[in-house]
């Protein structure tokens, strides 16, 4: 029987990336070291990494027909990512972002044109055949709709034997109040450093202890804190930590968080422990920071 897939639900966007030797001053005219088009978006990037790691994966997100979508779909296919779940929209434009990557320190500055393209709805998600997937990862966006999607998975899982249940993870990256209802869903919840700092926490460990009461019974909460590494807190109350694995030189951090999330999911889906998954996530994300793009992370 064919191995089940990992489905990532969220954003795909065209990233137009300018690599510069130093961040430009306002109102100046300068050359970049290189420029490339790259498929971006959190869930989309996580699919790229999962595929590079050897997982069978699929992407679900919104696209509008046109040249940009053609490029993005071709790139998904080149990476071996299944795009049969894409929600094609009759209105709106495919989103695009301009990214400045500073080659001297790896910083990335993103200016997103988040267009009028509708997000994937609970109605779109009703068409998904849940029997095809062993894991579904949801990037927090239109949370009220995503709660309905997560409830559908919960209802499905309630009818399945343990080995047939779909495992679920959720990412809460943006400090938007609407997204915080997603803490209560999924067996793995990724909360970003940005959200943790927005809520007044000064370290990953402090954030996990302060936010753990929001997750559902038995879930694990994970927080990556850039060069400080990452922490996880599960139902046993033991705080796990992995140091970061910085490359010899940081050149591109665009998508590092998505790389971490995907690597943790991949490791857990293979039956590894949370400590092993946390370490693996930090290792692969660290390697990515030393490379332009994603090629070469494995």
Curated annotation (Swiss-Prot):
One of its GO terms (biological process) is fructose catabolic process to hydroxyacetone phosphate and glyceraldehyde-3-phosphate. Its EC number is 2.7.1.3. SUPFAM superfamilies: Ribokinase-like. Pathway: Carbohydrate metabolism; fructose metabolism. It comes from the Eukaryota. Requires potassium. Inhibition by ADP. The N-terminus is blocked. This is Ketohexokinase. It comes from Rattus norvegicus. The lineage of its organism: Eukaryota, Metazoa, Chordata, Craniata, Vertebrata.
């Amino acid at each position: 029987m064919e191995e089940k897939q990992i489905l990532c639900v969220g954003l795909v966007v065209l990233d137009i990336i300018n690599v510069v030797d130093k961040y430009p001053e306002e109102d100046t005219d300068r050359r970049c070291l290189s420029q490339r088009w790259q498929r971006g978006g959190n869930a989309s990037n996580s699919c790229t990494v999962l595929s590079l790691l050897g997982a069978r994966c699929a992407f679900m997100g919104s696209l509008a027909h046109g040249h940009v979508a053609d490029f993005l779909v071709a790139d998904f296919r080149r990476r071996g990512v299944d795009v049969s779940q894409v929600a094609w929209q009759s209105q709106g434009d495919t989103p695009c972002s301009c990214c400045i990557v500073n080659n001297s320190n790896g910083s990335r500055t993103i200016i997103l044109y988040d267009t009028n393209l509708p997000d994937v709805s609970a109605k779109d998600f009703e068409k998904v055949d849940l029997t095809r997937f062993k894991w579904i990862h949801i990037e927090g966006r239109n949370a009220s709709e995503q709660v309905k999607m997560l409830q559908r998975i919960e209802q499905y899982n309630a009818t399945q034997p343990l080995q047939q249940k779909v495992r679920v993870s959720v990412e809460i990256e943006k400090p938007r109040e609407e997204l915080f209802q997603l803490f209560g869903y999924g067996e793995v919840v990724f909360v970003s450093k940005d959200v943790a700092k927005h809520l007044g926490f000064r370290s990953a460990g402090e954030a996990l202890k302060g936010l753990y009461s929001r997750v559902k019974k038995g879930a694990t909460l994970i927080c990556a804190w850039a060069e400080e590494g990452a922490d996880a807190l599960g139902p046993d109350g033991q705080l796990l930590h992995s140091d970061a694995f910085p490359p010899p030189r940081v050149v591109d951090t665009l998508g590092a968080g998505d790389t971490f999330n995907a690597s943790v999911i991949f490791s857990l889906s293979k039956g590894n422990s949370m400590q092993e998954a946390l370490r693996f996530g930090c290792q692969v994300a660290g390697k990515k920071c030393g490379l332009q793009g994603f090629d070469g992370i494995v």
